[in-house]
Each structure stands twice: as structure tokens, then as C-alpha cells.
């Protein structure tokens, strides 16, 4: 998501919107991220982490597709669909953004137990910034080379679908032991 943090406001301005619209749209990502993390995290307690984590990645990919539709997809002869479509895509991207963090933490706890959570979670989030930084950097390089973010966004979509499929293929199991906390 650092690609979004680093490039989103510029992207919306490149679509022809005023910088205040771009900044407001970016804040919409944050607002919908809070709701998504709480709702999808809660639903993962009831319906399984793997399914909801995979759903979150798919939802973000769909959000990016909707964002692309807002600017039009020339090779598919789809004209720009405008600001309402852009805002819809933004909400989908934001809604799924922090849900991944909350569900991943819960999944790590379920899978490895609370006694290992700090180590597992710390290792995961020590590695994730490397990919995030690389994504933001490569997105900027692609923009500089092509003058558009479309390749970077399509790459995000492909990687999100791959992540969703990978997560969905993992067998779900809970840690055995006394370090589990009962859900209330």
C-alpha cells in the first residue's frame, strides 16, 4: 500500500481533479480502512481467517480495477467513468487495506499460538516494508518512464490476485495448546 501512499494524490491530480479532491479522496481511503479492519476482522472470527484474508486481497484488486475504470481503459475501449467510479474504487481499496493487517495478526495467533505471536508478527512486519518500499519505488520508475500509473496499477492487481490465491490455498488450522484465548 505504500504505492498508494506515495502516488495516489498525484495520480488523482493526473486524472484532472483538483488537489483538494485528490487529498479528500485519499482521506476516504483512511476512513474506509478503519471500517474494513473492524468489520472484516470481526467476520474472520466467525467465518475463518483464510477466506476473509483472501477476500480482502480480491476486494483490493477489484478496487484497483474500478479505479482504472474511472480513468478509462483504452485497450478495452472503455471511456473514463469519472469521479463517482473513482470514489467507489477508493472505498474498496481502503476497506480492504487494514483488514489485511488485523486478519494476518489473528491468523498468526491462531496458527502459531500467542506465545509465538510477537516473533512471527515481528518477522512478518520486518519483511513487509521491503516489498512496500520496492512497490513505491518501482511505481515511480514506471510513471517516470511511461507518464502513467496504469502498468503499476495492473501489476498491483496481478500481485493481489496471486496473494489471494496463495492465502486461499493454505490449510487453516489452529494452534494446540493452552496459550489460546477464548473468543467472547
Model-based region annotation:
Residues 1-40, 101, 135:
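Extracytoplasmic gate region of multi-pass secondary transporters
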Residues 99-112:
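Intracellular juxtamembrane helix-capping segments at the cytosolic ends
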Residues 141-159:
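A membrane-interface helix-boundary motif in multi-pass transporters
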Residues 81-99:
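Hydrophobic core of transmembrane alpha-helices in multi-pass small-molecule transporters
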Residues 46-58:
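Cytoplasmic membrane-interface "Motif A"-like loop-to-helix N-cap segments
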Residues 12-13, 43-44, 138-147:
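Interfacial helix-cap and linker-helix signal at transmembrane-aqueous boundaries
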Residues 59-78:
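C-terminal ends and interior cores of transmembrane alpha-helices
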Residues 157-184:
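Multi-pass alpha-helical transporter architecture, strongest
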Amino acid at each position: 500500500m505504500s504505492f498508494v501512499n506515495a502516488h495516489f494524490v498525484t495520480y488523482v491530480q493526473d486524472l484532472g481533479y483538483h488537489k483538494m479532491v485528490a487529498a479528500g479522496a485519499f482521506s476516504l481511503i483512511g476512513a474506509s480502512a478503519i471500517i474494513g479492519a473492524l468489520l472484516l476482522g470481526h467476520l474472520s472470527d466467525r467465518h475463518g481467517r483464510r477466506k476473509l484474508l483472501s477476500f480482502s486481497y480480491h476486494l483490493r484488486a477489484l478496487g484497483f480495477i474500478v479505479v482504472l475504470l474511472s480513468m478509462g481503459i483504452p485497450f478495452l475501449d472503455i471511456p473514463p467513468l469519472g469521479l463517482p467510479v473513482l470514489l467507489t474504487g477508493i472505498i474498496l481499496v481502503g476497506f480492504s487495506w487494514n483488514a489485511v493487517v488485523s486478519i494476518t495478526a489473528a491468523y498468526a495467533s491462531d496458527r502459531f499460538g500467542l506465545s509465538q505471536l510477537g516473533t512471527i508478527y515481528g518477522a512478518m512486519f520486518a519483511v513487509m516494508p521491503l516489498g512496500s518500499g520496492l512497490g513505491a519505488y518501482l511505481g515511480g520508475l514506471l510513471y517516470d518512464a511511461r507518464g502513467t500509473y496504469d502498468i503499476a496499477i495492473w501489476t498491483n492487481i496481478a500481485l493481489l490476485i496471486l496473494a489471494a490465491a496463495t492465502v486461499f490455498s493454505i490449510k487453516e488450522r489452529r494452534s494446540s495448546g493452552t496459550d489460546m484465548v477464548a473468543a467472547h
